[in-house]
Curated annotation (Swiss-Prot):
It is an enzyme of class 2 (transferase). Its EC number is 2.7.4.22. GO terms for biological process: 'de novo' CTP biosynthetic process; UDP biosynthetic process. UMP binds at G57, D78, T139, G140, N141, P142, F143, F144, T145, T146. Catalyzes the reversible phosphorylation of UMP to UDP. Homohexamer. GO terms for molecular function: ATP binding; UMP kinase activity. Pathway: Pyrimidine metabolism; CTP biosynthesis via de novo pathway; UDP from UMP (UMPK route): step 1/1. This is Uridylate kinase. The lineage of its organism: Bacteria, Pseudomonadati, Pseudomonadota, Gammaproteobacteria, Moraxellales. ATP binds at K15, L16, S17, G18, G58, R62, T166, Y172, D175. It catalyses: UMP + ATP = UDP + ADP.
Length: 242
């Protein structure tokens, strides 16, 4: 009898940036990218992996320029960004439901009948019942990034691994799109990331993962099979641990 290969991680938190959802577009959601992401996530669900997702909003709203021009304040700009993540979350939820994946959309901000309010207890229950949970509106507070929200949600739902999906295949010592001699790291410690200012995630996010000993994996979501490889425990991207 053939040996059944089981996923290494039973519950994960996947961070999808808004830029990842835009594909090759400057702004907006690339339908093909969204469809491929939903397929990759559906594969994990089929293997019994419990999946939580945090989505960013940079593909729909970037507030830095408006703030620089003095048109909106920082708090308002961050709130606009939170609402952008809700739109991305709605798209991701429907893409998953279209594949017959039961999905919950949970917001850190109360938004009436559009999205249910986030509760870690409810999220864990939904995940345990095989539903995917898409978390939107960041932490619900200004001044915190969606990377920080991803690490916070990952800790709250007791995820075995936090995955950051990017457009590059891991962490490099410098920008590989600008420098041909950029070197990729296969493994890093959280302290290395902080000391070398590698820009994997912001300081708060990295410290959360380090202090709660939750490993982080950075990988290229656009690479076919990469998400599955990470969850199966295969070598893919860059792994960051304590």
């Amino acid at each position: 009898m053939a040996e059944t290969i089981s996923p290494r991680y039973s519950r994960i938190l996947l961070k999808l940036s808004g830029e990842a959802l835009s594909g090759n577009k400057d702004m907006g959601i690339d339908a093909q990218v969204l469809d491929q992401m939903s397929l990759s996530i559906a594969h994990l669900v089929g293997l019994g992996v419990q999946v939580g997702i945090v989505v960013g909003g940079g593909n729909l709203y970037r507030g830095s320029q408006l703030q620089k021009d003095g048109l909106v304040g920082r708090v308002t700009g961050d709130q606009m960004g939170m609402l952008a993540t809700v739109m991305n979350g709605l798209a991701m939820r429907d893409a998953l439901v279209r594949r017959n994946i039961r999905t919950r959309l949970m917001s850190a901000l109360p938004i009436g009948t559009v999205v249910e309010s986030y509760s870690s207890r409810d999220a864990i229950r939904h995940l345990s019942q095989g539903e995917v949970c898409v978390f939107v509106a960041g932490t619900g507070n200004p001044f915190f990034t969606t990377d920080t929200a991803a690490c916070l949600r990952g800790i709250e739902i007791e995820a075995n691994l936090i995955l950051k999906a990017t457009k590059v295949d891991g962490v490099y010592n410098k920008d590989p799109s600008k420098y041909e001699d950029a070197v990729k790291y296969d493994h890093l410690t959280f302290d290395q990331v902080l000391d070398e200012k590698l820009g994997v995630m912001d300081l708060t996010a990295i410290c959360l993962c380090r202090d709660h000993n939750v490993p982080l994996q950075v990988f290229d979501m656009n690479k076919s099979g990469a998400l599955l490889s990470v969850v199966m425990g295969e070598k893919e991207g860059t792994r960051v641990t304590k």
